[in-house]
């Protein structure tokens, strides 16, 4: 195998593909990055941990085709530190690849590439086409309330559901739930449900080109994303997601509009006092909603108290209840827009947080906590 490739292009694509590689994998082959030089002057770069797979194509001048696997831990760092110039890579008979840059060279041991898992194109039973920026936004909103508890795997994923001409995204960590959606999608089915690992979607959001159309293929156990010269494939999570439509309240007795930054700043100040008591006190923040003001208070027994008033516009009843301040902070940091709406019923029932002023394509549901 012998080819010439630009250092910057090679590095950019290695950094993308390397997100699917685990250096802790007990199989040496899966701790590496697959390189294939093709006769039509392309360099195919691939990484996988058998759960997530990423493949990219780079233009190269190929003199001799071939395929090998290089240890990602060393290869990526070496390429990162090479000068920005054309690099010449060629395999030698002693299972080493020579990397020539200017008048210098580095040699690395490699594995044969014939046994490395492939990333097949497949025609999904469900095929979608959506805008890249819409997909990135939906993933960003959803992933903040995903569980890390592997004993309940469906909550470590995000539900992708086609229903009523929309692509719905639903996630939950059992304390909170997020619902958002994308309209104006091209699709070949009217109904579909799949649960995609949140960590896979996080990488998709990082990798894809936001200004491009994204093609998605889904089968019963895998999903494939195509964006420009990049393909990402992931296994799906087995199981049935919770009936989120039954969980989200439809009517409310209390509805407040509030400036998001004012609420977030206040909660972050309260968190400074209570963060060392999270495990024992659930980081509880009291909300006392009056006619024109939200009173936020919190107490840390060994640190002190906080009491703040924030102007609001209230429709409905006054109410007093508690929330986990950390959970609220994580949600608010993830919302764009100046103003939000918080809708409530009673101190034991879930409330919801929505955007205002045209930023209304999402709902966060959050459970209150019992006040001491």
Predicted regions and their residues:
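Structural preference for solvent-exposed beta-strand-turn elements
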Residues: 1-372
């Amino acid at each position: 195998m012998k080819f010439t490739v630009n250092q910057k292009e090679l590095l950019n694509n290695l950094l993308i593909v390397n997100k699917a590689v685990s250096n802790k994998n007990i199989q040496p082959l899966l701790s590496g990055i697959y390189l294939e030089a093709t006769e039509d002057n392309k360099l195919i770069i691939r990484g996988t941990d058998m759960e997530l797979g990423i493949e990219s194509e780079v233009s190269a001048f190929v003199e001799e085709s071939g395929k090998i696997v290089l240890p990602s831990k060393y290869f990526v760092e070496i390429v990162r530190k090479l000068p920005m110039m054309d690099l010449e890579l060629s395999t030698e008979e002693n299972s080493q690849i020579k990397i020539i840059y200017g008048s210098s060279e580095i040699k690395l041991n490699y594995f044969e590439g014939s046994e490395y898992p492939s990333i097949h194109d497949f025609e999904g039973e469900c095929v979608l086409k959506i805008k890249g920026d819409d997909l990135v936004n939906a993933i960003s909103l959803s992933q903040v309330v995903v569980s890390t508890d592997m004993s309940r795997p469906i909550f470590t994923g995000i539900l992708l559901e086609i229903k009523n001409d929309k692509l719905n995204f639903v996630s939950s960590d059992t304390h909170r739930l997020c619902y958002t959606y994308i309209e104006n999608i091209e699709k070949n089915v009217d109904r579909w449900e799949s649960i995609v690992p949140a960590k896979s979607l996080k990488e998709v959001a990082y990798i894809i080109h936001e200004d491009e159309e994204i093609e998605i293929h889904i089968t019963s156990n895998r999903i494939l994303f195509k964006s420009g010269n990049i393909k990402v494939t992931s296994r799906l999570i087995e199981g049935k997601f919770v009936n989120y439509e039954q969980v989200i309240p439809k009517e409310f007795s209390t509805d407040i509009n509030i400036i998001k930054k004012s609420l977030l700043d206040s909660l972050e100040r309260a968190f400074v006092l209570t963060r060392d008591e999270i495990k024992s006190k659930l980081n509880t923040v009291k909300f006392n909603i009056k006619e024109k003001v939200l009173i936020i208070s919190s107490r840390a027994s060994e640190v002190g108290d906080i009491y703040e008033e924030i102007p609001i516009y209230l429709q409905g009843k006054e109410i007093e209840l508690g929330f986990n301040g950390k959970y609220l902070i994580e949600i608010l940091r993830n919302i764009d827009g100046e103003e939000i709406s918080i809708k409530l019923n009673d101190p034991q029932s879930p409330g919801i947080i929505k955007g205002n002023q045209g930023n209304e394509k999402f709902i966060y549901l959050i459970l209150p906590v019992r006040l001491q």
